Amino acid sequence: MSQSTRARTSNFARTLLRFLLVWVVDAISLLLTATLYAGISFAGIAGVPVIVQAFAATFLLSIVNLLIRPLILLLARPLGFIAVFIIGFLVNGAALLITSFLLPTFEVSGWISAIVGGLVFAAINVFLTGIAEANDDGSFYQGVIERLARRRSFTNIDPQTRGLVLMEIDGLSYHHLKKALADGLMPSLEYLMDNEGYVLSHVDCGIPSQTSACQAGIMFGDNTDIPAFRWYDKDKRKLYVSGNDATELNGRYANGNGLMRGGSSINNMLNGDADKSLLTLAGMFDGDAEEKKRRAEDVYLLMLNPYFLTRTIIFLFVDVVREVWQGWQQRRRDIYPRLNRLAHGYPFVRAITTVFMRDIAANLTILDIIRGAPTIYVTWPGYDEVAHHSGPWTGDAFKVLKTYDSTIARVYRTIRDKAPRPYDLIILSDHGQSFGPTFKQRYGISLKEFIEQLLPQGITVAQSMGGDTGVISLNAASGELSNIRDSGVGGIGGQVIAERGQRVLDNMVQEQESSDGTPEADKPAQVTAYGSGNLAQVYFDLLPRKISLNELNQAYPAMVDTLVSHEGIGIVCGYEDDGTPVVLGKSGRRNLHTGALTGEDPLLMYAPDAPDAFGHASLETRAWQVRRVMDFPHAGDLMVISTVYPDGTVAALEELIGNHGGLGGEQTDAFLFHPADMRITQTRNSADVFHILNDHRDLPLSETPREPADREDTADDWSLGNLWSGIKDVSSWMPLLARALVFDRLAYVEIAKSGKMTGPALLIGCVFAALAGGLRTASGLDTRAIFGNVAWWFVGVLAILVAGRLLNRSSGASYTQTMRAVGFAQAGNIIGLAGLIPPLAPLALFASTVYTFCT
């Protein structure tokens, strides 16, 4: 069988499997709708179970929808996506009425019942589809959207070189990802490790460990003079806030050689010289009318799928409820530390970052993969946002991380099945997150209040911390809605909704920023502390330049020494009279230019020796990182970093219990999850990651395919956790099942080698062996025949293994590997279902026997 024929056959099998899965979900949804809503019902027929009637009704409903969906798009598309959404629900009601007319046992009592029933059916269907992890791949609307997207393909597609798809999980540390993998929360990544030879590598992002500095480093190879997320420029007398000033920062580093040159930036702060940017703060309101219209049309394309919009809205509100529930559980159990998770509309901010931005960004990424963009960089901020408020080690954070695994799997399948060029999929983080009660929670006082106590009465102090949170995504979404409105895309209704949505998002941004304590322009302060996480840049207005420690001591005697001596302060960095930066600790002092030490090295707590320690790095690396920031022209007069406590936690200087921006703990422990042939060099700043990725970009295809390392079976393959984790990961084993059904030999090799396939193989083998036993029973339900057939199946697996060993003594296959392959092969018994129709029974038995022989 040729490769193209195999691909077409495999696609057909996948389509068939998807149809069967959707059919089952639709039947259950319709049955539940009839149970919950009186306007829809099934008339009882003697000897015909209601579930059979539900399957018949949904089959007819799918045919009706298939015929009228093109009409929906034809009529509604010129009116905008809101018209598609509304007309879609009206047509759902019409489809239910038509189905009730064609199938007398299915009853719908009028138009109102049809429309309301359609809404109930859609809501239940979305919920069940989410549980089954059945996405829109292969659906009618997705097919239309992808065909329209290809009309704007990238022109620089080279099928002989590798493209890059870079998926950033904001704020996920190397250590937290290792735990997620160990707990079976990321089966897609485990699949890539087992079958594609992927490797997880540690990256030190340096300081400041926050998004603007890290993305500038990763995307441009330069993040000079970004001393914190917020900082003050004494020369310009301007407060810089990375999110608000992303366009200026991007222009500082852009030179045409960024990582995404010629490619696409999706949901980022900076754009890496991308030709096309969406949901990216840098250049959000710049660009010509053509570029803005192209962005608006991409978002509009997604909205043509009413099910996508429905699902996203429903799951957004589900996540709001989940956050309220999790916050209540945290309070009920008196878990400490904790925050007020209802303040400033946080549940909605969380839902937008975890659900809305995830789904929108993932679908935009898929469109650009189909178009052949040379490099695509997309960020998901959901984990970072939840970890900030719940804590990075909590179940809340890991649960939301698990939801992103299916998104990774979907992008991987798109690369494998639909991309016009080869891609390397790389998962990475910009920085990690550290954990602990905040400075104020520990000591009952903020850094601002503590500094005020050390200054003469009348000296005003202001503090503005944070901002590297979900606010970035709110601003990005607001900007794209503004662009849709200004570009005239989406119809009148769509533009009205875009304007209202933008207003809501802008209000949410203002609410969030009001909690940051940004100094008001008409109330200048003499001392200001800016930054994020456990790092603050402190500026004094005594002089329009950097102020030395001696000058500060003369103006405010004992202030610096008292600051250093506080239990919660780890180091205070300042300047000698000649501008040389120094680090002050409780028991020592370090000259950052010469390395000269007095007493104990104050950086020691930030450089643990153990290779697996949180924040592991050499003293030389930490000294280089701190010196580099202090040498920035616009670093503060003082740089304050909180201490690392004996339990490994840190104290954020802002009110977030999961934090990043400075040193200590996991916040500098970023990661790269990459193909084995990617060369990883030592890193001490995110700018080093640029060179690693850029060197891998546009590489010619390898003449030999990558082979995953052979994997030995372990007892863990049969653990209940592994079995259940594999079974739940439908998005991984369903494509393999489709390929196995069409005799794809490579699929069977992947199945046999993957420990995650043990559970699915056991399920498929037992279910279809039982099915075969039941179908061979002439009358009634013979449980002995069913269980006997399952038992004989296990014996048959052993017989196949023994025969294979006798025929090929070099075979290294184990019983478990053989069981996996034979288990998936059992799916061919699905043909036997046709035997339930008496006239087709002999043909079904013959076809099933032939298929079993072929496998």
What annotation goes with each model-predicted range?
Residues 137-139, 221-374, 379-391, 494, ...:
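His/Asp/Glu-rich, glycine-adjacent segments
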Residues 239, 243-252, 262, 266-273, ...:
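Active-site neighborhoods of enzymes that stabilize oxyanions during catalysis
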Residues 42-56, 60, 81-82, 780-837:
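Alpha-helical transmembrane segments with an aromatic anchor "belt"
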Residues 355-356, 360, 368, 376, ...:
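A long, amphipathic alpha-helix that forms part
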Residues 140-197, 441-442:
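Active-site-proximal N-terminal segment of extracellular/periplasmic enzymes that hydrolyze or transfer
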Residues 406-446, 581-584, 639-641:
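Metal-dependent active-site segment of extracytoplasmic phospho-/sulfohydrolases and closely related
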Residues 2, 22-28, 722-813:
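Selected alpha-helical membrane-embedding segments in polytopic membrane proteins
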Residues 179-216, 221-225:
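Short, structured active-site-proximal loop/turn typified by the sulfatase FGly-forming signature C/S-X-P-X-R
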